[in-house]
């Protein structure tokens, strides 16, 4: 794990290295503070949830290898801080990313209303071929929902995004979001072999 400018006790992520892999895909996770980005990463990489995790300061890193269509793919995932004061740091990590996950909290309307700003950054600072995924996190808190599934789905369709509602706590759709987006990247790679010319670079 790499912590850039971090302070305080943070969850640690295992780097599940395989002896070999066919591709290295760089992912970046963005979105407002406290929407659950760090716990999504923790759940995907370590299969656990940290209910009292601190806000991300700067950038955190985790990786995991998965098998898609008989291909071993290593995902290198960068979890970025959501605070405005770290926005310039976050923007630097779009470079070389083949997937951007934009995360909001289904129980916080304000985090959904920030999506246009995050999407603008994504389109400005990442490759035009980047696969973009909209993640509505904290789906386990249905009673506190402030953003309907249909509204989020409409936003995703309007902007050409993949869409999943997830729960980092229960693991709902966490693996699916990474696996399905990886499948989409592999499809793009078939028609554009140069897509990964900068794979894994910051």
From Swiss-Prot:
Family the UniProt entry places it in: Belongs to the small GTPase superfamily. Rab family.
Record keywords, A-Z: GTP-binding, Nucleotide-binding
UniProt PTM comment: This sequence lacks the C-terminal cysteine motifs subject to isoprenylation in other Rab proteins.
Record gene name: rab2B
Listed GO biological process terms: hypotonic response; vesicle-mediated transport
Residue numbers covered by motif Effector region: 53-61
Gene3D superfamilies named in the record: P-loop containing nucleotide triphosphate hydrolases
Record GO terms (molecular function): GTP binding; GTPase activity
The organism of origin for this protein: Dictyostelium discoideum (Social amoeba)
InterPro entries linked to this entry: P-loop_NTPase (IPR027417), Rab_GTPases_membrane_traffic (IPR050209), Small_GTP-bd (IPR005225), Small_GTPase (IPR001806)
PROSITE patterns recorded: RAB
GO cellular component, one term: lipid droplet
Protein name: Ras-related protein Rab-2B
NCBIfam families given in the database record: small_GTP (TIGR00231)
Positions that bind GTP: 31-38, 79-83, 137-140
